[in-house]
Amino acid sequence: MTNNMAKNLDEIMEEHIPNLASDLYKTCNDLLRLQMSGGTGNLYFVVPGQGVEYAGSNDRNIRGYIVRWDLYKQIGMPEIKNDEDYVNVIAQMVEAAGGVTKSGSTLYGMGISGTSLGDWYARGRYIAEAGTRPTFEGYLYEASVKDGTLLNGYTDMDHSAFWVDMRFYNDMYNAGLLDPDSFTMTGSELGEKVKAGTYVASRTRDNNLYNVNVLEDVNTLEGYVMIPSEGAVMHADFLTPCGYAPGDYTFLSASSDNWEAAAKVINFYHDPDVSRLIYSGIQGTHWDYDADGVPQLKDEVFQKATELGYGSEAFFKETGIWGGYWELTPWCETGSHPDGYFYSLFQEQTNRAKALNAMDKDFATTYGFATPSAYHVSLIDSGKITTLVGERGLLVTMGITDIPLDVQRIMTNCNDILFQYVAELVTAESDEEFNAIAAQCQTDLADAGEADAWQWCSEAYAKSFEVVNPIFEELQAEYLAHPAGRP
């Protein structure tokens, strides 16, 4: 905007992007004008993922304590309250499987593609001890999911996704449960190992394991599930009134000779029926309205979802239903269509049980519920589980547009320092050695000027927080009064 690269959408909206002028987008557009206009009050961006992500959780919830369901059942489903319990459960599953895969190779507890710093703390964000979300994207100043308080993930070692994960991976390594290839493995290499059944647990729910096994046995229980725990943050009820901004956004180039064609594309995607199309398929082919005006998926679509897995590559190839958002999809799955139902009809509570695969159905019935998400909701609404309903860090950082270069350099240097210590921390042979390495890391961070970067970022965050927090709390109160996605 400083260089006049982005076109002012307010000037062309009525004629060229009329769908964006709909009241459906008023909250988002007003927030973008407030937080991402460079002080002009104009609209320059469109964003994906608006609504409430994972309203009422999700039957394939991807974050938290992830285990291989068949083995977890085999060892008696012990409770997982914290990372210590998790490591013990992982060890029991490896032992129950005899320590080897079907092909006879070594069975590990977990592996990650650890070629960047972010790989080594993505899991830790969803452990309640930290409970943070990406805020200053790519850096360790992250907001608490509970109340939006900015936490210093470099130095506050008790509330840092990085330090939580360093302790966890150190415990895993010393127990012989962490794949040593984790330090050098690429994402594609990890994916192949997951498909081969190399791990009994996963940093996130990786459906590749199940998707491979279900092709051989439609009733397989060999796949990953998330075990709800008071020690983890559940990825549910995530209010995204401004989508995934400021990390994800689209703008029209002010210098383009073809901006009108680009505006047509944006207008097309902001037709709410297009988001329904992306998540639920073609009206008349995959779903239609019944006599009461309720959108209903067709039985054959449920059958394919059950057999192949909604959102899987096989399901997409068979039905043409993508089942996921991309950068120009304005709404998330559990955003509300003007007809009053979710954009993804698969996420309606009346439909969730119909679309379950055999493994997820077995998980739900084992715990006495119709769906995994119904089990999750019972814990959420009874106050036993922390969710993302308090996350507002994204809205706050939307208003922080110009981080000084010297501050960016300090934070980048701090990231480099942390990454340099990862291998030493993970492979430390004792608590004493781990603590000594951590102390030296803290000294290096201090010498790099981390305190100066923290001062600037915390002050900028506080200023933006003051502006946007009252708006968020009003939206939060409205949602909590009538939470969506409940049985």
Regions found by a protein language model. Give the residues of each.
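Extracytoplasmic/secretory soluble proteins
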Residues: M1-P487
